[in-house]
Amino acid sequence: MRLGMFMMPVHPPDRMFWSTLAEDSEKSVLADQLGFDELWLGEHFSATTEPIPSPMMFFAGILPRTRNIAFGTAVINLPNHHPAIVAAEAAQFDHMSKGRFMLGVGPGGLVSDFELFNNPDVQARNRMVVEAVDFIQRIWAQDPPYDLQGEFWQVRLKDGIIPALGVGFMPKPYQTPGPPISISLASPNSSSARTAALKGWGMISANIIPTYSVASHWEVYCKACGEAGISPNGENWRVARNVLVAPSDSEAHDRVFGEQGSNRYFYTYMREVLSRVGLLAILKPRPDMPDEQTTVDAITRECVTYGSPKTVLDKLIAFRERVGPFGTLLMTGLDWGGPNAAWERESMHLLAREVMPRFRQHVLAHAAE
């Protein structure tokens, strides 16, 4: 059982960009110091609330300040990029980090980005992900000439090749055959879980979704594995959750549900933005819950794991028994405005030092039974 940090990130839109970048960098370095195994970062081009357009550029900025933590994109929204650019940039950062890199991919989740890049069709975006990964892996696996023809892109490089000078040759990753690939999952019974099973990719279940939706990802994955004659393995399944650990249950409750708390801001924002685009169902604790009952408090109660170290441990054990054998827990990093910086630092310490060792012991003991 590994521990990682996931950041969309979400910040109030009136905060200065340089300030949130510095804050998220500080949080990332702290995660490395506390022994977090992984750091995953989102990509959004057209929202000052979710202000990171280049996770690999962010990682490059903090790379010299870290020692062990691995870096993952969560995710590169492939419909917004030519696959040759992603292949080259991923190969470069894989070398910069000497293999501490994981390529998370997805079809995108921000409606303004869909409009910006003229990709409104969700089914087309899903096909674009599969085609782009195929092209990326083929670029990594072979030297030119290239003549890759797809539904959405072409990669052609035949004439401008000078082998003795290295001209025409794409960079290859540090890892062989390349960085491990994972795909994001945010809807119940996501078809991307089936894609992950058939392609051998990892899965990243989103932090904003309820328990039943996370469980459905494992069910879809296992069904696809069975159809393909593959043994399902949760080792490469990552589940992101909002986690807040405090010295006592009452303190944790106040920090989660209080008006100053970043979880309150986070779910207020998510509820509003998803409601406006007709996607509130993603957040509903039950599929049949009426919209008017899908309040910020109801979503928070369902999606935030909070309490004392013992309470959070018990909740994580129960959660994993309910959803399936995920191999990595990703704690969601939130905004540090007001008292939240001190609260989240304390939560990170308690999760890493008190909760996770016991959670790992439980998982190992359960696996040995």
Q: Model-flagged regions — what are they?
A:
Residues 1-71, 177-179, 368-369:
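N-terminal beta1-alpha1-beta2 module of alpha/beta enzyme domains
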Residues 3, 35, 43, 62, ...:
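Conserved, mostly hydrophobic/aromatic
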Residues 38-62, 77, 109, 208-211, ...:
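Glycine-rich, proline-tolerant flexible connector loops at the mouths of alpha/beta enzymes
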